[in-house]
């Protein structure tokens, strides 16, 4: 599979079409071990992923329409915060077109470039907002999936 084609829905290694209570580095063990967990007791965080694995509207809803794109890693996806508090949601409040949050936890600069390439021709892209991931990260391409590599 060519993961770098234009007019192709971007690949995500996230859950697809579900709502889950934990995701990625936000998991129950880290919550239990957090000495400040009491500060989070009244904050509802869940992760609703669309059919393509992104924490945003269904992509098919916006085909051919004007949109802004937000790209990046877990900070863009909003891991550990309610979706309304993720930076793409805050920027979207000041914009006149829908913002598609295409951030993926563990993303690399490869991921950002690949997803942007995929979106060309799918949407009428107005602006692209990027919070660049660490430059040491990269993607490995397999026949039917992509792996994110984060060197230690």
Question: Model segments located where?
Answer:
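Serine-esterase "nucleophile elbow" of acetyl-processing enzymes
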Residues: 50-110, 115-120
């Amino acid at each position: 599979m060519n993961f770098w084609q234009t007019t192709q829905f971007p690949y995500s290694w996230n859950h697809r079409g579900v709502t889950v209570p934990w995701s990625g580095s936000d998991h129950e063990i880290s919550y239990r071990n957090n000495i400040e967990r009491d500060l989070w007791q009244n904050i509802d965080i869940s992760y609703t992923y669309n059919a393509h694995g992104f924490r945003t509207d269904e992509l098919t809803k916006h085909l051919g329409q004007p949109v802004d794109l937000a790209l990046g890693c877990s900070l863009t996806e909003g891991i550990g915060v309610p979706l309304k508090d993720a930076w793409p949601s805050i920027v979207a409040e000041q914009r006149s077109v829908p913002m598609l949050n295409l951030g993926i936890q563990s993303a690399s600069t490869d991921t950002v470039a690949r997803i942007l390439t995929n979106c060309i021709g799918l949407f009428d892209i107005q602006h692209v907002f990027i919070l660049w991931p660490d430059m040491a990260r990269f993607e490995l391409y397999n026949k039917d999936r992509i792996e994110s590599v984060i060197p230690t």
